[in-house]
């Protein structure tokens, strides 16, 4: 199935010059969303995943159905102040400043094999920070899966040494 035909390109969103890749037009078609999810599940099965991790918010949209299909748990990565219990945190650079991602301190057990999921790989900053959180907790990043990779932003370079699946490249 050609998944690209189900992604809507929205010019100048959220600001002029950006060609936003809208995945809601993929997700609102059950058979297409299922197909995309199944592709990631197949990839994850080969990796013997113990838990799926995804950054808010669209990492949840991809990761939760994958975790469900695999029969494993899902651990959210959230911005600072959004998780109610003790967390580990990592600060990471943005184009104009810094941001912080957090994860519950007990979300990953040492040695667990982790699949990280997100909707889109752009610069790689968010996923690099997510990897740092997983590894701080002793998890092993067995794979990283995206619906979309924006190749011209070269985010894959920040993730060298990790196994990556991108279902579509733009």
UniProtKB/Swiss-Prot annotation:
Coarse class of the protein's main subcellular location: cytoplasm
Matches recorded under Pfam families: Pribosyltran
UniProt keyword Glycosyltransferase, yes or no: yes
Record field: catalytic activity: AMP + diphosphate = 5-phospho-alpha-D-ribose 1-diphosphate + adenine
GO molecular function: adenine binding; adenine phosphoribosyltransferase activity; AMP binding
GO cellular component: cytoplasm
Top EC class, one word: transferase
Quaternary context: Homodimer.
Family stated for the protein in its record: Belongs to the purine/pyrimidine phosphoribosyltransferase family.
Function field: Catalyzes a salvage reaction resulting in the formation of AMP, that is energically less costly than de novo synthesis.
Protein name, per record: Adenine phosphoribosyltransferase
Native source organism of the sequence: Geobacillus sp. (strain WCH70)
């Amino acid at each position: 199935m050609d998944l690209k035909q189900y992604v809507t390109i929205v010019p100048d969103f959220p600001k002029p010059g950006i060609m936003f890749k809208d995945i809601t037009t993929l997700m609102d078609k059950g058979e297409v969303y299922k197909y995309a999810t199944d592709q990631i599940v197949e990839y994850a099965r080969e990796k013997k995943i113990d838990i799926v991790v995804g950054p808010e918010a669209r990492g949840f949209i991809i990761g939760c159905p994958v975790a469900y299909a695999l029969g494993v748990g899902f651990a959210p990565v959230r911005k600072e102040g959004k998780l109610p219990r003790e967390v580990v945190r990592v600060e990471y650079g943005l184009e104009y400043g810094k941001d912080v991602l957090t994860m519950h301190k007990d979300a990953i057990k040492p040695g667990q094999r982790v699949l990280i999921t997100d909707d889109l790989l752009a610069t790689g900053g968010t996923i690099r920070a997510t990897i740092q959180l997983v590894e701080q907790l002793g998890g092993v990043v067995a794979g990283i899966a995206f619906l979309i990779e924006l190749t011209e932003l070269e985010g894959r370079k920040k993730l060298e040494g990790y196994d990556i699946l991108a279902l579509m490249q733009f």
